[in-house]
């Protein structure tokens, strides 16, 4: 471990996780590293959860406000949720136990745009940060903190926190050192902010390590534990069909000179649909691709390996166990092709617009006019959060939403008369793709958009119902610009809640 903690003076701060966890008090605001299940602290949260459970058994209160980069893993969100140790959570979560706490009303939750979290923290929206808890690959001779498999909001939390706890994780590959690009300009401060001088996805503008006043470092914990690295389902026929429509669209846009032959910087969400698209791009005609995204997932890693993609910039990895092992074994090959940045840079709307990114994101549902619900099932039950989809959707050159046309074995339609919750308004959604087809909505009015979405994207089981609703709304709506029948616009959702299906009996 001495080669991991190369600053001799800081070795005296090494202690067990149990001791470090005692620094975290009831009511503290704690900012941690971690983004899409990568690079989050693992041992101190487990020790903290045990202390919380013991306090609760004594009838004492012991909860914290937990602010991260994005989702973490079972050792952090899972353990603290089991202990009922979080009274407020932001900005993104995928842990099932934490999700249950949120949807039961036991943990307050706000799914902020990921690109805005650092700025909100600097502005004091989350309160005063008592603790920054970050995972590191190593600590350099001059006290620099080498991040691990994500960057997230770590630098901002280190700047703001009164005390710092560092987990130095030996499981993380030491060759991660040098892969990060931490810009030390004023990204998120007020009242003025510096322009982040990125004009190409492959550009480095900062340094390789996080910086913090060493006097703030209160504890260093040695760990050896892997990231979440959840497996991805192999793309099914539905995902492959969606990918096929999108690849044909890209080819058409190149022929029309609306896209260059190498496309534009790609942003992609995670999951089997996203991986199917990336797999298709790996086999397709486009070369010298670049990624400017928030995550690097299996499909993007495969494109880097094949040479189809030359550089990928993000804030984090989100890999299957197999892909994580692959990159660990071949880090000397991949490290020159990857840049990990803080998330208020990876998700900066200004950079996204400057680079002209192509944004590809999933959704829970969209209405017939193209308003998108990415977060709340039936309008009220939180799934994960808006993540970075809002950062990219509004500012990208192309904003694309991908989804199977149905869910729950056909019991839910992804295209509905009115979205039960809206994360992305119609002005931020240009292209919709389901396994039924692709709707290009650029330059269309709401009525024209509805005709395209219903005919191109809706499932045949639901298409006649949508067409009937739209036809009657055209005749009887209060206004004819965006026709709706308010007495039945959300009736599909209520039918599912009442009967378990959106289809009428």
From Swiss-Prot:
UniProt-listed InterPro entries: AcetylCoA_hyd_C, AcetylCoA_hyd_C_sf, ActCoA_hydro, ActCoA_hydro_N, NagB/RpiA_transferase-like, Succinate_CoA_transferase
Enzyme Commission number: 2.8.3.18
Relate the induction remark in this record.
Expressed at intermediate levels during the first growth phase, when ethanol is metabolized and acetic acid accumulates in the growth medium. Up-regulated during the second growth phase, when acetate is catabolized.
The pathway that the record names for this protein is:
Metabolic intermediate biosynthesis; acetyl-CoA biosynthesis
Q: Name one GO molecular function term.
A: transferase activity
Question: Which catalytic residues are annotated?
Answer: 294 (5-glutamyl coenzyme a thioester intermediate)
* Alphabetized Pfam families for the sequence: AcetylCoA_hyd_C, AcetylCoA_hydro
Please name the top-level EC class of this enzyme.
Answer: transferase
Q: Which UniProt keywords apply?
A: Transferase
Kindly list the positions annotated as binding CoA. 269-273, 364, 384, 388, 408
Q: Give start-end of the signal peptide.
A: none
What does the record say about the knockout?
Cells cannot grow on acetate and have lost the resistance to high levels of acetate, a characteristic of wild-type A.aceti.
Q: Which GO terms describe its biological process?
A: acetate catabolic process; acetyl-CoA biosynthetic process from acetate; succinyl-CoA catabolic process
Q: Which reaction does it catalyse?
A: succinyl-CoA + acetate = succinate + acetyl-CoA
Activity regulation, in the record's words, is:
Subject to competitive inhibition by coenzyme A (CoA).
Transferase keyword on record = yes
Q: How does it assemble?
A: Homodimer.
> What protein family is recorded?
Belongs to the acetyl-CoA hydrolase/transferase family.
The record's function comment reads: Utilizes succinyl-CoA to convert toxic acetate to acetyl-CoA and succinate. Required for growth on acetic acid and for resistance to high levels of acetic acid. Also has low activity with acetoacetate as substrate.
- Name of the protein: Succinyl-CoA:acetate CoA-transferase
Species per Swiss-Prot/TrEMBL record: Acetobacter aceti
């Amino acid at each position: 471990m001495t080669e991991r903690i190369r600053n001799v003076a800081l070795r005296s701060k090494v202690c067990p996780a149990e001791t470090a966890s005692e620094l975290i008090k009831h009511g503290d605001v704690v900012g941690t590293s971690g983004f899409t299940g990568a690079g989050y602290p693992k041992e101190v949260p487990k020790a903290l959860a045990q202390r919380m459970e013991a306090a609760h058994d004594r009838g004492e209160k012991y909860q914290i406000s937990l602010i991260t980069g994005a989702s973490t893993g079972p050792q952090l969100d899972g353990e603290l949720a089991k202990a009922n140790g979080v009274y407020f959570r932001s900005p993104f979560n995928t842990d099932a136990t934490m999700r249950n706490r949120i949807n039961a009303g036991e943990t307050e939750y706000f799914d902020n745009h990921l690109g805005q979290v650092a700025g909100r923290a600097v502005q004091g929206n989350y309160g005063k940060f008592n603790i920054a808890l970050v995972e590191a690959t190593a600590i350099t001779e001059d006290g620099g903190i080498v991040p691990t498999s994500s960057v997230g909001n770590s630098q901002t939390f280190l700047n703001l926190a009164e005390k710092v706890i560092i987990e130095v994780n030996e499981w993380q590959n030491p060759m991660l050192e040098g892969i990060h690009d931490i810009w030390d300009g004023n990204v998120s401060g007020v009242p003025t902010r510096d322009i982040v001088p990125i004009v190409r996805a492959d550009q480095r503008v900062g340094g390789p390590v996080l910086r913090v006043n060493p006097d703030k470092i209160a504890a260093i914990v040695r760990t050896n534990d892997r990231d979440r690295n959840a497996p991805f389902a192999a793309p099914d026929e539905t995902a492959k069909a969606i990918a096929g429509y999108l690849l044909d669209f890209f080819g058409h846009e190149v022929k029309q000179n609306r896209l260059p032959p190498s496309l534009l910087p790609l942003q992609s969400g995670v999951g089997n649909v996203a991986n199917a698209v990336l797999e298709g791009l790996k086999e397709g005609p486009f070369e010298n691709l670049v990624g400017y995204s928030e995550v690097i997932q299996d499909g993007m890693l495969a494109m880097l390996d094949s040479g189809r993609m030359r550089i990928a910039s993000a804030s984090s990895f989100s890999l299957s166990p197999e892909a994580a092992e692959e990159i660990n074994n071949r880090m000397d090959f991949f490290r020159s092709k990857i840049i990990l940045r803080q998330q208020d840079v990876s998700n900066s709307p200004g950079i996204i617009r400057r680079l002209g990114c192509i944004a590809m994101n999933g959704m829970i549902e969209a209405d017939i006019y193209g308003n998108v619900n990415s977060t709340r099932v039936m309008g009220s039950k939180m799934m994960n959060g808006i993540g970075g989809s809002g950062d990219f959707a509004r500012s990208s050159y192309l904003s694309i939403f991908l989804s199977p046309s149905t869910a729950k074995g056909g019991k839910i339609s992804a295209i509905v008369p009115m979205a039960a919750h809206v994360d992305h308004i119609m002005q931020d959604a240009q292209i919709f793709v389901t396994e039924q087809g692709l709707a290009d909505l650029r330059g269309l009015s709401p009525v024209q958009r509805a005709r395209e979405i219903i005919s191109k994207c809706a499932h045949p089981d639901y298409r006649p119902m949508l067409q009937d609703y739209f036809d009657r709304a055209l005749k009887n709506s209060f206004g004819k610009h965006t026709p709706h029948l308010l007495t039945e616009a959300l009736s599909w959702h209520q039918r599912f809640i009442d009967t378990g299906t959106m289809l009428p009996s």
